[in-house]
């Protein structure tokens, strides 16, 4: 399924599964997807934690699993799928994830970005259930790629938007996601490849490394989001710094490239040998992301980076 109006495309499940295995959520960690769509990242998070830990599923989801999205239909689907996955108490909310506590909304303000959505923020809903909330332990997400945000009451809250009257939505999501992390928290975020490679966006990368200890970058195959878009994307993994630095030290970063993305040039799943149509898509797809997970774990096992609960 695709949510193409704002460049929102539901992430292939084998990509989600790879990201969750690399981020390795623990049972005591809070996990947020601020662009949750149908809840894929949250479902795979639940399955990962349940598979690796003795877990009271409902108690875990009451406080640890959080998802927000602007699309009310996506939230309804996410709630249904999370219920099927074994959770009746997931914290799934329809709201504009780009609204911050400093957005200065008035009761009667209207605009294209948040019109019709509740005016509370992610911090509002988190503080209602998490005592002493100071940020999430993990943010894992695939934010909308396309479109620009022009609303001044939103832009003024963002460092990356203070020099212009409009900015691409995914740039704001990047800053917002890091802001929503506690210091030391981990992130896995899917981004258009140009944000990590184009000279035009170098100021975004300069801001990023001051606030985030980048650990790894995974380049996804060009067919990954077909048949919905040819947009090439990467996944950024990192740890929020305790405080922003002016100029980071030389830090080792692992660069990974997926060379088999599990789809053909028309976006159809390429199945690996020994599977049937009864198997889930992320099991059937002929991809190399299991090798990516192994390479990442090998890298982390020899690194002094504090990663995980």
What kind of region is each of these model predictions?
Residues 5-124, 138, 146, 192-194, ...:
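Conserved S-adenosyl-L-methionine
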Residues 100, 106-109, 113-309:
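A conserved structural/catalytic subdomain of Rossmann-like adenosyl-cofactor enzymes
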């Amino acid at each position: 399924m695709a949510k193409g109006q704002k460049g929102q495309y539901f992430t292939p499940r084998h990509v989600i599964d790879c990201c969750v295995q690399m981020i390795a959520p623990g049972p005591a960690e809070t996990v947020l997807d601020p662009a949750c769509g149908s809840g894929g990242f949250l479902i795979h998070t639940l399955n990962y934690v349940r598979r690796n830990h003795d877990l009271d599923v409902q108690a875990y989801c009451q406080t640890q699993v959080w998802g927000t999205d602007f699309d009310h239909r996506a939230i309804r689907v996410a709630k249904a799928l999370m219920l099927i996955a074994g959770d009746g108490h997931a914290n799934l909310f329809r709201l504009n994830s780009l609204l911050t506590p400093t957005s200065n909304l008035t009761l009667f303000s209207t605009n294209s970005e948040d019109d019709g959505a509740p005016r509370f923020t992610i911090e509002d809903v988190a503080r209602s259930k998490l005592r002493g909330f100071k940020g999430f332990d993990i943010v894992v997400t695939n934010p909308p790629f396309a479109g620009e945000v022009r609303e001044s009451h939103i832009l003024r809250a963002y460092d990356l938007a203070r020099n212009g009257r409009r900015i691409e939505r995914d740039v704001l999501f990047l800053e917002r996601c890091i802001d929503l992390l506690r210091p030391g928290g981990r992130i896995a975020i899917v981004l258009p490849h140009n944000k990590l490679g184009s000279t035009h966006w170098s100021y975004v990368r300069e801001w990023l490394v001051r606030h985030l200890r980048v650990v790894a970058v995974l380049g996804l195959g060009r067919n990954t989001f077909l048949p919905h878009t040819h947009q090439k994307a990467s996944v950024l993994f990192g740890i929020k710094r305790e405080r922003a630095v002016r100029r980071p030290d030389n830090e080792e970063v692992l660069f990974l490239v997926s060379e088999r993305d599990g789809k053909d040039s028309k976006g159809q799943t390429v199945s690996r040998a020994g599977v049937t149509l009864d198997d889930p898509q992320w099991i059937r797809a002929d991809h190399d992301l299991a090798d990516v997970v192994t390479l990442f774990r090998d890298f982390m096992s020899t690194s002094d980076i504090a990663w995980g609960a």
